UniProtKB/Swiss-Prot annotation:
Protein's name according to its UniProt entry: Ribonuclease HII
Function: Endonuclease that specifically degrades the RNA of RNA-DNA hybrids.
Top-level division of the source organism's lineage: Bacteria
Main location group: cytoplasm
Native species: Enterococcus faecalis (strain ATCC 700802 / V583)
Amino acid sequence: MAKESIQAIKEALLTVTDATDERLASWREDERSGVQQAIKQWERRQLAKEKEWQLFKEMSQFEEAAYKKGHRLIAGIDEVGRGPLAGPVVTAAVILPKDCQLLGLNDSKKLSAKKRETLYNQIQEQAVAIGLGIADQGVIDQINIYQATKQAMKMAIDDLAFTPDYLLIDAMQLDVPQPQESLIKGDARSISIAAASIIAKVTRDRLMEEYDELYPGYGFKNNAGYGTKEHLLGLEKYGVTPIHRRTFAPIKDMI
């Protein structure tokens, strides 16, 4: 009887989810290096999935605690863009379903752009509700970045299709009627806040890509408005744009 081709085994391994699968024992006895390499790749994938599951469970603890208290619509809230010299601060509020199984959720800054996009789409498909809040540079200059962030977070809550009955917020306290919990580094500790972080990050990055076309020469699509060398050189060469924050150094010294 002819042996299975290496390609056939590779494809079959993509369907194997259990280490007790009898086929694994058979393939492990196959002396072909291509088969052994494929098994090692499968083992690495399994280990990565196990780590993702463990992280997911750890990051679900705050949601589980809120469910046990009787809450049902738990919103995670986060912001992106407090530090840049240009562009808005973007906030998101996300209510995930109780049986959510979005593996890979983490602080958006720890994820690759490709992974963020994948998770962004999955969150859009699975979330109970998503709300966005945006405070532009005019608001930031008028009331300061801290207050602008709070204002944008409230906007994100109001933008939700359903009113949440509990809030998990990344390092912020809000003057709202719902009970809330402020978590330092919450985007790496709560699946709901992590989801909000990803929605806010992808939304803001897309906005900055549009601004890059509108105001070329500052590298907005690469630096998202942060004060990189390319951005600072652009300021020296082309001056201040309408999306720059005039109360932030060095812009305030240039006008």
